[in-house]
């Protein structure tokens, strides 16, 4: 049994969990998330707690226990992330470093000048909110942890930090190890 799944996921007030045909729906004050799961584990709601237990029917061979334990911990974390997402939400902050590098919102698109000959245009997905409080700062927020991280990674990939100069888009707090330049 996974060490994580030995403990239940405690549901805060205002959060409900529905389980139907291996699909878990979590509703909360910020919205609703749903996720489909494989039948290796049983997900049960008891009061204000969610338990993730092994599904004994799926274990045919002794070697199946390893797979069941693996999915048990993974699904426990995914459900916990869904509960936190619908109550608090997730946020990733990016900073743009470089002279002339900046970002701005234009309707439903993020337009960035990143030193290329043309501005980089990124279409903002509907399930994620992007704010630009300053020209060199981007805040990506939403209720789905995986989606927020994916969008932040896509934006960072347009101009990752240069290892020699440090210019580019980086996460706030990310330390970029810089290499030494050429010796003259």
From Swiss-Prot:
It holds the Pfam family Ribosomal_L6. This is Large ribosomal subunit protein uL6. Belongs to the universal ribosomal protein uL6 family. It comes from Thermotoga maritima (strain ATCC 43589 / DSM 3109 / JCM 10099 / NBRC 100826 / MSB8). InterPro entries: Ribosomal_uL6-like, Ribosomal_uL6-like_a/b-dom_sf, Ribosomal_uL6_a/b-dom, Ribosomal_uL6_bac-type. The keyword RNA-binding applies. Keywords: Ribonucleoprotein, Ribosomal protein, RNA-binding, rRNA-binding. The lineage of its organism: Bacteria, Thermotogati, Thermotogota, Thermotogae, Thermotogales. HAMAP family: Ribosomal_uL6_B (MF_01365_B). GO terms for biological process: cytoplasmic translation. The keyword Protease does not apply. Part of the 50S ribosomal subunit. GO terms for cellular component: cytosolic large ribosomal subunit. This protein binds to the 23S rRNA, and is important in its secondary structure. It is located near the subunit interface in the base of the L7/L12 stalk, and near the tRNA binding site of the peptidyltransferase center. GO terms for molecular function: rRNA binding; structural constituent of ribosome.
């Amino acid at each position: 049994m996974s060490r994580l799944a030995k403990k239940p996921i405690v549901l805060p007030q205002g959060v409900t969990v529905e389980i139907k045909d291996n699909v878990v729906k979590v509703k909360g004050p910020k919205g609703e998330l749903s996720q489909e799961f494989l039948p290796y584990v049983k997900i049960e709601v008891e009061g204000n707690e969610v338990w993730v237990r092994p599904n004994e029917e799926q274990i045919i061979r002794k070697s199946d226990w390893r797979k069941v334990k693996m999915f048990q911990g993974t699904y426990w974390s995914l459900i916990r992330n869904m509960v936190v997402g619908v109550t608090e939400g997730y946020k990733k902050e990016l900073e743009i470093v470089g002279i002339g590098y900046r970002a701005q919102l234009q309707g439903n698109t993020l337009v960035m000048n990143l030193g290329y000959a043309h501005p980089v245009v990124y279409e903002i997905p509907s399930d994620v909110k992007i704010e630009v409080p300053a020209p060199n700062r981007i805040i990506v927020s939403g209720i789905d942890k995986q989606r927020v991280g994916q969008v932040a990674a896509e934006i960072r990939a347009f101009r990752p930090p240069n290892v020699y100069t440090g210019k580019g888009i980086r996460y706030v707090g990310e330390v970029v190890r810089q290499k030494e330049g050429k010796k003259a």
